[in-house]
């Protein structure tokens, strides 16, 4: 997914349809030129509706859409006929999309399932026709209700990538290479920092036709929570991942220190992230023999599953997938220290 095509934040002005006016009408029959009231009700306007679409990964299709409008309802007819309803405006969004009020930041709606629909902006109701106002004391009402106006409001749509596993690490930790090895995703890979400028998603095939989603989140650096590097823009995507897979290269100067920096950035951004299951994966492990791995394990944090792998030699990838799958499907327990 090219970074220029990955849009995870848009602000749009939405206007639901206004309701149609009720009709003022009286029956006109051959032998009853001035019959009773038969004005129909107006039709409701169209809603603005969010719909989840599993085929979408970005809000790119809404980037240049500043106004979203639904149809107005039609006025009531004669012979008690109701006016037609305005057509709803369906806005398809990726799973993980949240709608917020731009003034308060309050969450209005959240889409997490394919085909899920939520009315984002409700339509105006149609007005009642004069037939509805007939009473024993007023057999010929000459008035009807106007339709309710539609609602116009600015809305922020924010995407938080839904994935089972989120890759967390410094730039150049080998996250994109790993994703390309265990899935069909083709992220850009190069020997310089911030190659990944937007989250990349890949479907990891597992045993017996099972699979899970892995997300390569752009590299985190110290100070990311304060906006350094690519800043907090992409940290929010980690919030939707079930497991955080920390990737640190075997040739790092201090693996434990890097791990602690990454944890600290997540803690500063959102302490709830530390309640998620996490696994520490040491990449480029072809540089280490068994003795070095054993020594290294002694220095690493206790209580955190650690796995060594090499994308270059395809070593340890099966074990890594096994560990991810097992962790993903175990009963939830207290968070790790």
UniProtKB/Swiss-Prot annotation:
PROSITE patterns: G_OBG, GTP1_OBG, OBG. InterPro entries: G_OBG, GTP-bd, GTP-bd_Obg/CgtA, GTP1-OBG_CS, GTP1_OBG_dom, GTP1_OBG_dom_sf, OBG_GTPase, P-loop_NTPase. HAMAP family: GTPase_Obg. Keywords: Cytoplasm, GTP-binding, Hydrolase, Magnesium, Metal-binding, Nucleotide-binding. GTP binds at residues 169-176, 194-198, 216-219, 283-286, 310-312. Its main location: cytoplasm. This is GTPase Obg. Mg(2+) binds at residues 176, 196. GO terms for biological process: ribosome biogenesis. Belongs to the TRAFAC class OBG-HflX-like GTPase superfamily. OBG GTPase family. Pfam families: GTP1_OBG (PF01018), MMR_HSR1 (PF01926).
